[in-house]
Amino acid sequence: MLDEIPIDLLRTWIGKQDHQTDIITHELVKRFNATLGGYTEINSEIPLGIHWCLAQPSAVHADLGEDGHPFKGGFMPPVPLPRRMWASSKIQFHETLKVGLNVEKVSTIADVVFKQSKASGPLVFVHV
């Protein structure tokens, strides 16, 4: 199966970066808290979980694949497998998140690894 996965091509994505920016607004915090409960005052520290709502890439509908993600081959390598799965994260915060803060999210492809699973078949891990 390794011959069918162009791992050398996929590994050329290593080092590729995606930069997204956003501003933490009071309205975003309000919507976040309405979803998960709680309330955060303006200019107070906000829960770290809100980072999942920040600096999301935008893609027009025509640029989305069947799975709802942007087509593979842009920031993410074009892995020729039918499904994607999030496995884990390593996230760094350089300062406390507060309402009004301009944030930048930098995602970097650190590695692309092929594995063969007895249960699932071929897997490609893209370490971002």
Predicted feature locations:
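Hydrophobic, proline/glycine-rich low-complexity stretches
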Residues: 1-102
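Hydrophobic beta-sheet segments that form the core/acyl-binding groove
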Residues: 84-128
